[in-house]
Amino acid sequence: KVGEKLANIIVECAKYLMIILITMYTYECFTVFGYADGDKKRRILRNQNKLMFMIHFLAFAGMYLKIGEIKILIFYAVQVVLLLAIILLYTWIYPKASRLVVNNMCMLMTIGFIMITRLSYNKAVKQCVIAAGGVAISLAVPVIIRKVKQLSEWRWLYCGVGIVALAAVVVVGTEQFGAKLGFMVGGVGV
């Protein structure tokens, strides 16, 4: 009983601390534009990463205290590795990429991981695998386009395929939890 009460207090405190950390993260998204000094900007962007990982840790610590299953901690560690890999690979492969955009992408992924893990662990694992695959593709596509110049000339084809795919979701998509998110092709969800 005492352990459970302590866990509840920690979880409640973590909720408020996460709100404060998200506010600090958001504030730094705007303040980074106020500095011309590259070192100061890098410090702010690195601090954003620290804030993001603190939010991530607090959320998963709270889930672990509530659920008490080791799989939550393992899944947390996998996500940390994925997020670190994204930050490092994007800045290494694309040194001119906006670090703020990369940070915001990782922050949104973190929030998504937290939300879906709270709802369904199995769906969260599936989503994490999809996110890792999407990141791998997003890292490879620009390199491939640079190597095969003709691919960059097919913009209208990509646009058309995207519009047709979105229209297919609207027309034949199956509704789950009030949203049409995809459709089935030969028993495979798209």
What residue spans do the PLM features occupy?
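N-terminal signal-anchor/start-transfer transmembrane helix
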Residues: 16-33
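Membrane-helix boundary/helix-loop-helix interface segments in multi-pass membrane proteins
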Residues: 8, 39-190
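Hydrophobic transmembrane alpha-helical segments in integral membrane proteins
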Residues: 5-21
